[in-house]
Design a protein with these regions (language model features):
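Structural recognition of an alpha-helix C-terminal capping motif at a helix-to-coil junction
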Residues: 19, 33-40, 44, 53-65
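Arg/Lys-rich amphipathic alpha helix in sigma70-family domain 2
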Residues: 48-50, 61-80, 139
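Internal acidic/polar
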Residues: 69, 74-99, 118, 153-154
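DNA-recognition helix of helix-turn-helix
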Residues: 64, 68, 126-150
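C-terminal flanking helix
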Residues: 14, 18, 39, 102, ...
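A short pre-motif secondary-structure segment
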Residues: 108-112
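Residues within helix-turn-helix
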Residues: 29, 120, 131
Length: 154
């Protein structure tokens, strides 16, 4: 992949990177720093990408590591997903319900339903088994259903 094509590809994925960082980091500036660091590392390590088909997964993995680095440095727990993380036309309570999910369940749900990643891509990005991704998504969907139905009758 040429440098120009690589740059075009990562620029095209920048919005996705910001949305994924929303599911992990709380502070807007921390999210911006994590995405910036991700893009910088990706550029420096672009020659280590073995297969162009996995560029998106590779970038997400770098981003997740950067987000965890921010957590480690700030010792902060994720507590907020901005409204933009919810898909257009989504139930307004979805944002609040997503906030109630633990990060390990929330991240695969955001990657799959809001960013369109496959189970396999999520498993590669999070470095977990595809079965674990499915299990976390199943548990997350059940919890979301429970939370959203509770709000409906409140």
């Amino acid at each position: 992949m040429t440098n120009e094509r690589f740059a075009e590809e990562i620029i095209a994925l920048t919005d996705t990177l910001y949305r994924v960082s929303y599911s992990i980091l709380r502070d807007k500036y921390d999210r911006e720093d994590a995405v910036q660091s991700c893009l910088e590392k990706a550029w420096k390590k672009r020659r280590t990408l073995r297969d162009e088909r996995y560029l998106k997964t590779w970038l997400i993995r770098i981003l997740i590591n950067e987000c965890y680095n921010v957590h480690r440095h700030k010792r902060e727990l994720p507590q907020e997903i901005p409204e933009q993380a919810a898909p257009p036309g989504a139930d307004p309570n979805l944002h609040d319900a997503l906030m109630c999910l633990p990060e390990e369940v929330r991240t695969p749900i955001v990657l799959h339903y809001m960013e369109g990643y496959s189970i396999h891509e999520i498993a590669l990005a999070l470095r977990i088994a595809p079965g674990t991704v499915k299990s976390r998504m199943r548990n997350g969907r059940a919890k979301l259903k429970e939370l959203l139905s509770e709000e409906e009758y409140s």
